[in-house]
Regions:
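Iron-associated oxidoreductase/ferritin-like identity signal
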Residues: 2-182
Length: 182
């Protein structure tokens, strides 16, 4: 790699630099005996966050599948509007999954490739109830993940999760409206 430095060409030996993952190895800066990362956050905190984010990612995969299937199989004129909304929800859930995978990688983890098992019902109202319960569970999980992220000093992550949770709450509102619960 060649870069400019004070109008001179400078060669940089990239072999001297550690890889992104190598830079994430534990160093002991914490006050207890638990290994910590370079910022002094106990590695178990980040591992817990990564596990939680992977669980959230698996739920997003499930949501994508359910929204795609349900938007295509809802029956009845009264469900036309929500069927269109579910298509939008599916694309938003994909955006959430992409962001979660990015954050998991940033924290040094490997994003899961396995989703939670999708649910199905042939009854339109039951499909929406399934989605509503899933959204409510997801919101609860993201609130916990925000708490964990802030405790670990991962404030950018907590802000990303707040953006995601706002969309999940919009999904909850759409589903409650479609079910006549609001």
């Amino acid at each position: 790699l060649i870069s400019f430095h004070r109008k001179k060409y400078v060669k940089i030996n990239l072999k001297k630099f550690k890889s992104k993952r190598d830079g994430r190895k534990s160093v002991s800066k914490s006050t207890n005996s638990e290994p910590a990362d370079a910022e002094g956050v106990p590695s178990s905190s980040k591992e817990e966050i990564i596990r939680g984010l992977n669980d959230d990612l698996a739920r997003e995969y499930k949501a994508i599948i359910q929204y795609v299937v349900f938007s295509s199989t809802l029956k009845g004129a009264e469900y036309g509007d929500i069927a269109e909304q579910l298509k939008i929800h599916a694309s938003q859930e994909l955006s959430h999954a992409l962001e979660l995978a990015r954050q998991i990688d940033y924290l040094g983890g490997d994003p899961t490739v396995k989703g939670k098992e999708a649910e199905y019902s042939g009854d339109s109202k039951t499909m929406l109830e399934i989605d509503l319960r899933a959204e409510q569970e997801t919101i609860k999980n993201y609130r916990e993940r925000i708490r964990q992220a802030e405790h670990a000093g991962e404030f950018a992550l907590s802000e990303k999760l707040r953006t995601i949770i706002a969309q999940e709450q919009d999904h909850e509102i759409d589903l409650k409206d479609a079910l006549g619960l609001r």
